[in-house]
């Protein structure tokens, strides 16, 4: 069985084909980073228009890569939310239209479930149950996962997501969009301990996060110190260490409260090398395991949507003829599979 996956929730157009026996057959991705760089962030209207231009050509490229034709596709999965409404509508409209034309089921997929299941694409996928850290530009959540669709929200950011804080702080440091990866690169040249940033909300019980204050602390530190390259690198290092430590402390609490031995890390920020190293070290000390997708599957991509679509299709999930998207869509609302 083969599922075509379409991802257009923000500023990446991702198309992939997943086979339940052979695995990933094709993976095509187009990033709009250069398009939005001059604006310092994603412009929703520009994102939607670029998805219109790229989605169908990428589908054609994916079919060619896999050596397949439309008649070989058994279902079409598309991201139905959460995300930018215009961008979502492009993928949903194309996906629903192709499914109708090809006479196959259409499968609406939750974007964050796609991220959560992305590590399942690897050779050593995690078994249930596990704690999932979903950490990206739009979300920072800790979730108890006991099965497909069996998700319990343990904690989340009450303001900025971790990835958003990375990007905003990078902008304060004069780095171009997207700033998160560039800040991490700068931090690798920084001196540990020169600046010490707070670890927000770790001095009290609970599993919620808050990163807006950390961003403000960074802004004040930048204003109060020199603008030389080493100082900026030291500030970047202090900021990254604070975010990583905060995430690690909360993950440890979540594992302690659930009693689980497995931690899954997903979303764009999960590609951060410092975060991966710290969580791997923590899980080794706890005699547990940490799982994450390869870097190209941490950011938005069609492969995770094709895989999640396969899982949901086997559970009987399909869409009607209408095109419906949900820019806001709590993960806990998904049914168990």
Curated annotation (Swiss-Prot):
Its EC number is 2.3.1.234. Substrate binds at residues 134-138, 167, 180, 272. It catalyses: L-threonylcarbamoyladenylate + adenosine(37) in tRNA = N(6)-L-threonylcarbamoyladenosine(37) in tRNA + AMP + H(+). It holds the Pfam family TsaD. GO terms for molecular function: iron ion binding; N(6)-L-threonylcarbamoyladenine synthase activity. It comes from the Bacteria. Fe cation binds at residues 111, 115, 300. Belongs to the KAE1 / TsaD family. This is tRNA N6-adenosine threonylcarbamoyltransferase. The gene is tsaD.
């Amino acid at each position: 069985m083969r599922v075509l996956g379409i991802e257009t929730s923000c500023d990446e157009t991702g198309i992939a084909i997943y086979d339940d026996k052979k695995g990933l057959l094709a993976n095509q991705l187009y990033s709009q980073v250069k398009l939005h760089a001059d604006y310092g962030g994603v412009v929703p209207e520009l994102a939607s228009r670029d998805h219109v231009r790229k989605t169908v050509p990428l589908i054609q490229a994916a079919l060619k890569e896999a050596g397949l034709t439309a008649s070989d596709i058994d279902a079409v999965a598309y991201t139905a939310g959460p995300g930018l409404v215009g961008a979502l509508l492009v993928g949903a409209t194309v996906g629903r239209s192709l499914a109708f034309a090809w006479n196959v089921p259409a499968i609406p997929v939750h974007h964050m479930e796609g991220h959560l299941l992305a590590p399942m694409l690897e050779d050593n996928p995690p078994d249930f149950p596990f704690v999932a850290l979903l950490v990206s530009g739009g979300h920072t959540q800790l979730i108890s996962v006991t099965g497909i669709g069996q998700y319990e929200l343990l904690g989340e950011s009450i303001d900025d997501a971790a990835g958003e804080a990375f990007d905003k702080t990078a902008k304060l440091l004069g780095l171009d969009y997207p700033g998160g990866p560039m800040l991490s690169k700068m931090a690798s040249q920084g001196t540990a301990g020169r600046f010490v940033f707070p670890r927000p909300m770790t001095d009290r019980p609970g599993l919620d996060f808050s990163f807006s204050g950390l961003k403000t602390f960074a802004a004040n530190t930048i204003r109060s110190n020199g603008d030389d390259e080493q100082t900026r690198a030291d500030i970047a290092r202090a900021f990254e260490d604070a975010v990583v430590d905060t995430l690690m402390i909360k993950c440890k609490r979540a594992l302690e409260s659930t009693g689980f031995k497995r931690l899954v890390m997903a979303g764009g920020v999960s590609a951060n090398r410092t975060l991966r190293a710290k969580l791997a070290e923590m899980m080794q000390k706890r005699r547990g395991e940490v799982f994450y997708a390869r870097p190209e599957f941490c950011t938005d991509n069609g492969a995770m949507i094709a895989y999640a679509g396969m899982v949901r299709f086997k559970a009987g999930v399909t869409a009607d003829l209408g095109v419906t998207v949900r820019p806001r869509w709590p993960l806990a609302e998904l049914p168990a599979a």
